[in-house]
């Protein structure tokens, strides 16, 4: 038969409906028999919608193939609609009605429905897995290319009883183009029987007789023309009488009917016996013969010719064609696919039968057969790789289509080792380069169902598709890959929507979840729900890696984190909105804000102004801020550790801006009242004397004074304090306040800590005085007229004052330093910002540089206030004004650049300033040396009284300077700096400024001399680096980080370190260099000292770890150095002060470093750190050794602010030398704290446990492992026991991150035993319940039923709890232990068996399937705008846990579990062939099949039984102790190597009364068509007598 070129191929994924043969029943011959891999290609008499296009491989389209039309039989009640062909590789999930197949049936091919009763396995059609796989001849291809259609004979007329006439308006005409296209044959035309012709017995067709010229019907004469042609029936005249008389007498008799029945029964029995096939199977594969090369080629050419029957070719199959050579011959000769498969079967059957003929045993023959099939599969793989590797060659598309079709046909004919082939396919897809991936994706559509049948392959496919998608979506990939991206996205989408369980990826979900979400349409509710469900399932299998993931931050902790972030982000608006969203209760929010501003565990004034800005914003948004502040003041305790000065500062700022209602506060205070007791004054009353009164209305001020008097606080003290401070300040600044205070007596302030009422009044008074201190003011003109001293001693260094603007500020550097020191001492930075704004109008470059340094020092505060940008703009304008006059200095430029670098929006301005700085330096460096410098080296000396004058003359001459002159000046200045005193009377700061002005003349030479001088200074033992370096750091010649780096490099070299005489002194100098100066020593006296202070702050913020290293190195010298010299600096005190700053500036980072590298490094460092912590926590470290009460006190005082410090303190107590008793006690304290905090729904214990060492965490964790003590025969279902267990399990969940990666090996056997115990209890409960249902009576039954219901809920809780423990300790089951356990594989198998049996048990209340994980699991924090689905059933989660274990377990554990479920399944598990079992446990390996299946080559199935293979769960409670022998069924090894329609069902068959209930496995290699020249009675590969088959007679 010539296959029709336009006939479509029926999809394998959809079964055809049964055919009605007209008599109302389905023909059995059409339903019985092995499945056909492809339908016959039959010509269709009706026009098709589209002709078949030329064969192409297109990766961007997914058009379906035209399906073969069937004759319209009578429609049955269940009829599936037509669906697109499954051969299309498009993975679109919504493609027309695609069915989700179940394992065992999803990938099967439909039975062949032959309309002529042909053998069910037809080989006349090619397997076409790709669109357009049929090959057209040249003429048709040319016709199609030219736009025409290939010629075809006219269609047969439609039979009148099959179709009704079409309506007139439907399609009156049918064009020739729409007629079916047929290939032009190269052999003589042969009549083809229409597919719609009625079929009779014996391959006869009714009413079809093609014209041949000699039929009576073809003879045209007068009679046939008039009457037509008809067949006359020959009526026999032999029967003259009827049988009625003879039969009537017999039927009339009483026993006649019985006799008639016996006769008919005997007739039917005879008929049945004679019709049965009783002859033994005479099937033999076609023999092979030895042929010459020419004959072999001729035979292959005949095989390629479809007109040569296979029965003829089966007589002379040549030797020597096998393996890859066979496939290459089929490809090169163009042998049709079905005939190529026939040849492969013939060769394979002979090869396999040869093993038995060699006299080998059955087991050995099975092994040899399995090996041969694997080798044959490898040959097919090499064949496909070879064709794929020839990409780009001539006719590659045709060859590739043929190779894909042939290999797919071999695969679905079960002629390959499925496991090996699909594993190779996935490995090839994974290793394929991007340009070859489309071809593999095309083939993926063919094997999709077989790959997704088992998790072992489905998970691997999901991961490699995601990896490929991530690879092609890299930013460097261009637009040409977009079709490939779309195709991969479609596959991923299909995976998620149709095979969700294969996308449960515990190990890689975090890496791929964003990519998966991008492939879905999350606006679609279906996609969104599935993705949320998948995300929740994966999150249940995740193990937290650190405590941040486990410890879910409370709203209060998140708000504190937002407060802390403002210091670096400076975004008040966003932080304000985020805070309001985080905590809805405004009272809690404002209370937490005020605590944050006043806590001793934070540093700096920035938090004060942050609180002010936030409160102002919230006030403007309508929040009653005043009430919440007053409530906080009423609730705060007098003994609280809060710094109430900051609270009063905030309220004072709010009063200044008229945000806080003073009148309302006074009314509230009067209504509240105060107690007349000698106790400390409460905070709400202390606020009364802190309120600024200068801007209050008169009546409010009077009321305030009255309340002060009633409270016993004299009002005159405030007035006298203000007066004293004004007099003191006026004496320091006579040019500003001299006229007002000329008559005042010199005095000092008697109040070291003035109230904010006093500070606010003084601040406004100073601001008013600075505003009036201008060059055109009468006071300044009068003072200038009385002054006789020159304005500047050294104009180059102190600045140039040029009165270009009469309204410019007349501030001098000393006046500015004094004002700045006063306001910084007060902490009134908002008033300082106003004064700095006025100072920017000054024309003194030193004052302007000091203003810039001040803004840089308080940068965070001024950013929060909002004054930084205006101040920087004003400074730049003043610099531009001085630049136009030619009076800009290096000091101002340096300060502006340092400030501008911290303002992101001013980078362009900084670039211009750097250009000016470079221009000034180049101007000095490129200038020619002046004649004055020739005589300077001889005369210039630091002992010369006129040294400063000569130096000024040299630096201001405008000329250059050669290296010798610079050397002389440099070493002279350094000599002054080292001696700290000389006849020149230059201070260290002035000397450093001269050095800064000297550097631009020769920058490189200056830096070289400076490094050489510092190295020489390190080798000497006399000078102190902490005294010499600050001035150099202040002027910018040296940086702290550069000096620390230099010292580290020098100390790393042993030769250099040996030269340095005093290493201990150097480490101490480094520590003293970082310690801020104490107040009272005029620390901000001038420009240089202030800049050094700014440099210290910058080093603390940018290099905290290096600072801690310096402290640790210095305090290690305390034991050997202290006490020997009274002048020795207090190293421990300096270190403690510095540690306090570092701990409060960045608590989390500093505490983490102290835990890792500071504690235990040296005993002295631990002591110093303990002293610093005691200062912060308020402990007295001198009270004695650590005690348990101290540890309990630390735990009790833990809150959101002190948490890091309490962690550090507890760790130090745990590591204390006093011993292990204290250490164990600390663990006990932390254990109790964890239990109490968890019971009260708190989470602080997670925080202070989180940062501690792993030893402490594991000890606390072991304390909570009480689930190990679950008694075997107790009743754990009580409410109290469940609550306690839930409490401990929650703590274990929080500490899960402490489990090491290698796992805790001792936990694995315990969990296995607990799961076995749980299964044992389940079996006992089920047995008891079955007994109760059989003997149901009275109240006892009701009580037992209630007990059973309670037990089921308890079972669900413990099952979910143990599942979580298994997830946490998953690595303990897979990681190799130091001492390998002999029963490790058995533990893995037993664990899988327990999980699967419990999860799929059919309990009366269905609690396992409906109970959502016992409401135990903590849900992750909502992210990406949605909340994960909380309704994941416990059964689903249990199967996910089993899947995650199977992913990591060896195949042996999976196979042992499968054998147990097949042979020893518990009695309440009645469905071993559950699709979920098959999905998780498949596929079976060769060894498992060999152990459980009989040799295929045996002539008949064995009737005897054998003892089943013992499994690790043979002693499992509930399993039968003496299982029934397993009946073995005939099978073949290739049945285990392939996965046909019944393969999985045959692996997991139901064992019932010693018999294996399952399908009869067939031998695919022997399913041969036309195997022998002469057809015998039982010439089939399957022995028909085993099935009571009957002969079909024509």
From Swiss-Prot:
Q: Where is the composition biased (Low complexity)?
A: 81-93, 1499-1521
Q: Does the keyword Transport apply?
A: no
MF terms in GO: transcription coregulator activity
Q: What is its main location?
A: nucleus
Provide the GO biological process annotations: regulation of transcription by RNA polymerase II
Q: What GO cellular-component annotations does this UniProt entry give? A: mediator complex
One Pfam family of this protein, by short name? Med12
Can the keyword Nucleus be found in this entry's annotation? yes
Concerning SMART domains, the annotation shows: Med12 (SM01281)
Q: Cite the residue spans of the region called Disordered.
A: 1-116, 1499-1532
Q: Where in the cell is it found?
A: Nucleus
Q: Which UniProt keywords apply?
A: Activator, Nucleus, Repressor, Transcription, Transcription regulation
What does this protein's UniProt record list under function?
Component of the srb8-11 complex. The srb8-11 complex is a regulatory module of the Mediator complex which is itself involved in regulation of basal and activated RNA polymerase II-dependent transcription. The srb8-11 complex may be involved in the transcriptional repression of a subset of genes regulated by Mediator. It may inhibit the association of the Mediator complex with RNA polymerase II to form the holoenzyme complex.
> PANTHER family given for it?
MEDIATOR OF RNA POLYMERASE II TRANSCRIPTION SUBUNIT 12 (PTHR46567:SF1)
Q: How does it assemble?
A: Component of the srb8-11 complex, which itself associates with the Mediator complex.
> What family does the entry list?
Belongs to the Mediator complex subunit 12 family.
Please identify the protein, giving its name as recorded.
Answer: Mediator of RNA polymerase II transcription subunit 12
Q: What is the lineage of its organism?
A: Eukaryota, Fungi, Dikarya, Ascomycota, Pezizomycotina
